């Protein structure tokens, strides 16, 4: 039987705990340590070895009630998560303990820290993933096995858009999904669990939560916990996995909360100096290999709507598609409030999506860009000062802008409108008809919150 290696708590600084070990038992970086905190198990993760046989650790739960001199056990391994079929339909915390009041799984567990796949193992694919959301499919096509970021400030609809993607993709895709709730509202996690149960996608989904009420240690590691489950589905089962992370900014934020306590000098805007390294470690593991793919959708909170903030700016470089949510569009009552001019995808290329799709998408972007340029003239001089050509362009641009809106399935109970999914070919055809002037005699109001272009004609015919 292996000897139990024990140390003692030396200092407690909020979520950071120093533990002194005998020199021969000093744990390695990223090792999980365990102790009994008034009847409940507390897990610490070694972050630094600061000399004098002291391991500086980050707590995965509250440190209330800890005292100096308390015994700590070195588990001699990193934090591990249950993986495989046993986690489907279940809900876990950062250390792999169930939080759905069901028994703990007893099968295989994997460490949350592991190297990213090598270049030789990685696979590149340019298969389009249809979402049923018009603005996304037309202007920001998603790649199967790609990384997608949903950028937006507070209250512009990131979580609703992500839940809509879960609803549309998880239902049609038929593969397995992992949802990691990183530092977001517990209420939203609760709603998501019951919505998934109702729509019969829960048995194909694993959920991991480290919500905003939890200590920074849990919020810092929960994205890795969810990723570990997704990697196992990809590598051991050869599956195409969907990984949803809401919200990747909270991962960075949690790192900055403990960074100063760990004795690091802050860098730009007070973030941790290791920001790019930590983000890279996580993002490089979210990739497709020759065994299977991980398609990840990540919500990214943008502090004060500033896209140049180091946290969202660091995330940008890792993504294939960037969906930017705009408060100005949300204030017009148009949802999803996706900015067609700020959102980009590297798949919007005629060689990937085809010439017809590409040309319609470019024309939509051009007409909206010109409409934006004309806004100042309209505001000062009014529509009458525009040329006939520009007036026609403005009318069509408004119809295009309205037609980009769409009722969502997950917001049905708030809006009272049934959700709609639209096939890609119907989306392309609809925008082509607007741009070619086939809808010039229909009022722009009829283009709001509809699915196919045929619905617009029906709506207009009814109101004649």
Curated annotation (Swiss-Prot):
InterPro entries, alphabetized: AAA+_ATPase, ATP-synt_VA_C, ATP_synth_F1_bsu, ATPase_alpha/beta_chains, ATPase_F1/V1/A1_a/bsu_N, ATPase_F1/V1/A1_a/bsu_N_sf, ATPase_F1/V1/A1_a/bsu_nucl-bd, ATPase_F1/V1_b/a_C
Keywords recorded for this protein, A-Z? ATP synthesis, ATP-binding, Cell membrane, CF(1), Hydrogen ion transport, Ion transport, Membrane, Nucleotide-binding, Translocase, Transport
Q: Name one Pfam family in it.
A: ATP-synt_ab
Q: List the membrane topology term(s).
A: Peripheral membrane protein
- Give the matching Gene3D superfamilies: 2.40.10.170, Bovine Mitochondrial F1-atpase, Atp Synthase Beta Chain, Chain D, domain 3, P-loop containing nucleotide triphosphate hydrolases
User: What EC number(s) are associated with this protein in UniProt?
Assistant: 7.1.2.2
According to its UniProt record, where is this protein located? Answer: Cell membrane
Question: Reaction catalysed?
Answer: ATP + H2O + 4 H(+)(in) = ADP + phosphate + 5 H(+)(out)
Task: Give a short account of what the protein does.
Answer: Produces ATP from ADP in the presence of a proton gradient across the membrane. The catalytic sites are hosted primarily by the beta subunits.
Q: Kindly state the subunit structure of this protein.
A: F-type ATPases have 2 components, CF(1) - the catalytic core - and CF(0) - the membrane proton channel. CF(1) has five subunits: alpha(3), beta(3), gamma(1), delta(1), epsilon(1). CF(0) has three main subunits: a(1), b(2) and c(9-12). The alpha and beta chains form an alternating ring which encloses part of the gamma chain. CF(1) is attached to CF(0) by a central stalk formed by the gamma and epsilon chains, while a peripheral stalk is formed by the delta and b chains.
Keyword Ion transport assigned to the entry: answer is: yes
Name the Gene Ontology molecular function terms of this record. ATP binding; ATP hydrolysis activity; proton-transporting ATP synthase activity, rotational mechanism
Q: Under what name is this protein listed?
A: ATP synthase subunit beta
Instruction: Tell me which domain of life the UniProt entry assigns to the organism this sequence originates from.
Output: Bacteria
* Gene Ontology CC, one term: plasma membrane
Q: Which family does it belong to?
A: Belongs to the ATPase alpha/beta chains family.
The residues that hold ATP are 152-159
UniProt-listed PANTHER family: ATP SYNTHASE, ATP SYNTHASE SUBUNIT BETA, MITOCHONDRIAL
């Amino acid at each position: 039987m292996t000897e139990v290696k024990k140390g003692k708590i030396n200092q407690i600084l909020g979520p950071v705990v120093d533990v002194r070990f005998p020199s021969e038992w000093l744990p390695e970086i990223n090792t999980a340590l365990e102790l009994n905190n008034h009847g409940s198990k507390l897990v610490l993760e070694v972050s630094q070895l600061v000399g004098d046989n002291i391991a500086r650790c980050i707590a995965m739960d509250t440190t209330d009630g800890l005292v100096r001199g308390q015994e700590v056990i070195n588990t001699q391994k990193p934090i591990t998560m249950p993986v495989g079929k046993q986690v489907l339909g279940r809900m876990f915390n950062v250390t792999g303990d169930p939080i759905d009041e069901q028994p703990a799984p007893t099968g295989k567990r994997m460490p949350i820290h592991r190297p990213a796949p090598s270049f030789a193992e990685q696979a590149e694919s340019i298969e389009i993933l249809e979402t049923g959301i018009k603005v996304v499919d037309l202007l920001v096509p998603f790649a199967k096995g790609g990384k997608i970021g949903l950028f937006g400030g507070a209250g512009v609809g990131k979580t609703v858009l992500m839940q809509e993607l879960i609803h549309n993709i998880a239902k049609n895709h038929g593969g397995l999904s992992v949802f990691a709730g990183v530092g977001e509202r517990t209420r939203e996690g609760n709603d998501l669990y019951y919505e998934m149960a109702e729509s019969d996608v829960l048995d194909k989904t694993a959920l991991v939560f480290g919500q905003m009420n939890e200590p920074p240690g849990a919020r810092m590691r929960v994205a890795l916990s969810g990723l570990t489950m997704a990697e196992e589905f990809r590598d051991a089962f050869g599956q195409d996995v969907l990984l949803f992370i809401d919200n990747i900014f909270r991962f960075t934020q949690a790192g900055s909360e403990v960074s100063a306590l760990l004795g690091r000098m802050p860098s730009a805007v007070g973030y941790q100096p290791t920001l790019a390294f930590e983000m890279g470690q996580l993002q490089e593991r979210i990739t497709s290999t020759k065994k299977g793919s991980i398609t990840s959708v990540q919500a990214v909170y943008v502090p004060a709507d500033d896209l140049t903030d180091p946290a969202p700016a660091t995330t940008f470089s890792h993504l294939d598609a960037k969906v930017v949510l705009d408060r100005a569009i949300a204030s017009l009552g148009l949802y999803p409030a996706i900015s067609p001019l700020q959102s980009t995808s590297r798949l919007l290329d005629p060689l990937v999506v085809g010439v017809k799709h590409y040309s319609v998408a470019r024309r939509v972007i051009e007409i909206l860009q010109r409409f934006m340029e004309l806004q100042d003239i309209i505001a000062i001089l009014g529509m009458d000062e525009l040329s006939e050509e520009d007036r026609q362009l403005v009318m069509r641009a408004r119809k295009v802008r309205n037609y980009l809106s769409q009722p969502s399935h997950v917001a049905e109970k708030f809006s009272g409108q049934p959700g709609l999914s639209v096939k890609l070919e119907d989306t392309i055809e609809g925008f082509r008809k607007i741009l070619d002037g086939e809808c010039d005699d229909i009022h722009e109001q009829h283009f709001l919150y509809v699915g196919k272009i045929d619905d617009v004609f029906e709506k207009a015919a009814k109101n004649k």
